[in-house]
Amino acid sequence: MEMFNPPHPGEGVRAYMGDSITVSTLAKHLGMTRANLSMILNGRLGISASVAVKLSEAFPNSDPEFWLGMQVQYDLAQVRKKKRTKISPVLSKAA
């Protein structure tokens, strides 16, 4: 099975920012610290529901579900990449 490697949503934020919006400007506009926005942009911090709502308001051609969907896809891919003990079904098929 081929591994799906979705981008961190911070890459999507960068794309929406383009070259005309600075990190400081967007952070202030969203009411968050420059450090936290920078961590999102660099893939070190995830997007919460409240940040997703703010992003959808700042970039009206997006919606919160878009941002949270990117985050969920990224998170699931990270978990699937890790070596872990597989969990067996809790019920047998006969039940």
Segments from the language model and where they lie:
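Short alpha-helical "recognition helix" segments of helix-turn-helix
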Residues: 25-28, 37
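A short, Lys/Arg-rich alpha-helix, primarily the initiator
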Residues: 1-22, 65, 69
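Short, basic-rich loop-to-helix N-cap that marks the start of a DNA-contacting helix
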Residues: 44-58
